[in-house]
Amino acid sequence: MSLIPATTEMLFAMGAGDKLVGAGSYDRYPPEVERLPKVGALLDPNIEQILTLKPDLVVVYGTQAELKNRLERANIPYYTYVHKGLPDISETIRSLGARVGVATRANTLADSIESGVQRIRSRVATRPRPKTLLVFGRERGSLRNIDASGGVGFLHDMLEAAGGADVLSDVRRQSVTMTTEMVLARAPEVILELRYGPPDAGDADDLRQWNVLAAVPAVKRQRISQLRGEQFVVPGPRVVTAVEQMARTLHPEAFR
């Protein structure tokens, strides 16, 4: 059982999806996950339902202390998910694959991810690295509460692998809430915005909001792009696709 979108994807990708007896409420990929009972998520695990399903192993977040205590009392083993950066994806796949009895397939998957990311790194290695602001959230229709990737973590690692220079690389946090004044001071040459749902009528208006920061190089040169898909925020097997999408946006000439 997995309560975490990333590890649920990993288990399916390594060929262990048929072993799952339950999944997290926010687990949406692959489509086969929809057949599974939903047992809550980080803040609201349905502990009674989890125990009723009698899993042999539960993948949990490190902060789910109450759930882990109940699992221990029921003699149900758990695997604690830890994720800080890009290398943790392969490490988690290898260790989780060993726990569920598909080590060979898990190692093959991890090798494929590592080689895929390295292929993209090599492709953009000689290109100038534009100063990039990677935004993963803000208030719709405004430039308030701009949530951006800081200088550590999964998003930062993806951006660096894609050939961008994180404009917040000196801030040793995974995320930074920025004001427009901070964006002006950092002067990014490229702005990448991550979007998660289907396209809607507000997307174009959201892009236009940046025009008020005309002094920012990315705005002046119209180097602002929206990148869409959950693969950008779920640190799992689709990370190679996410890194390549970033790289193609930052360095289109490298993929011609």
Segments predicted by a language model, with ranges:
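A short, structured surface patch at a secondary-structure boundary
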Residues: 1-53, 57-67, 164-167, 195, ...
